[in-house]
Amino acid sequence: VDISTDKGFFLFIGLVQQMLDLLPKQLFLFDPLSLFFLLVIFIISLPSAIYSLGYLKGEYPFSKILLSWLLLVVFILSMAAVVSVGNVLIFLVAWEIMSLVSYFLVVFDTTHEKSIQAGTLYIIMTHIGTAFLIAAFMMLYQYSKSFDFLTMKNAAVAIPAQTKNIIFILLLVGFGTKAGIVPLHIWLPYAHPQAPSHISSIMSGVMIKTAIYGIIRFVMFILGVNSSWWGVSVLILAMISCLVGVIY
């Protein structure tokens, strides 16, 4: 009986150890890049939140105003999490929360059919982008066997150049969809005008910038620039996006 008890105890310890190994070893990553984006998030979100007090008052019942504020708080915190976590799985959770909450804020005024249509287009496009990100992250995981940023960065040196090119394209499409880079911008001119003014300002001023953070973090910090055509392609897409933005 004692032997079986000991075996059971050690099996239990082994199971607990395996479960602990699955947990992120580095939950947060605070460096100049993340701190800069955190500063931008809170500097822009705070006045927008204050503005919403007067904007929503008189337009909606108190219960709906309270719901709006709860969604807004979750929205801001999820954006802060996106730029400060150090693990891909936690990053994806924060990214998904940010996307879903921003969708509910876009369709906040359910009496307008255009809001529903804009929100539907937005949520479809954002999940297409997320699918590309998941594919890129899984390719990185094949080499790192870990979802922690620093481990992925160290393992990225062993990734073949051709594979790095594929991962770069997946990341560019995934984050480019959220950033509104042409031609992945089709959701942006519909969703932003339909969202309440304070939400539109946060989405355009902060949320789409989290995608820029993602490109910098995963392409430059983790993957490592592999070829000059990466920078050239980003520059060309940025110039085209600027031109289309001016025309709009």
What kind of region is each of these model predictions?
Residues 26-40, 81-93, 230:
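Membrane-entry segments of alpha-helical transmembrane domains in multi-pass membrane proteins
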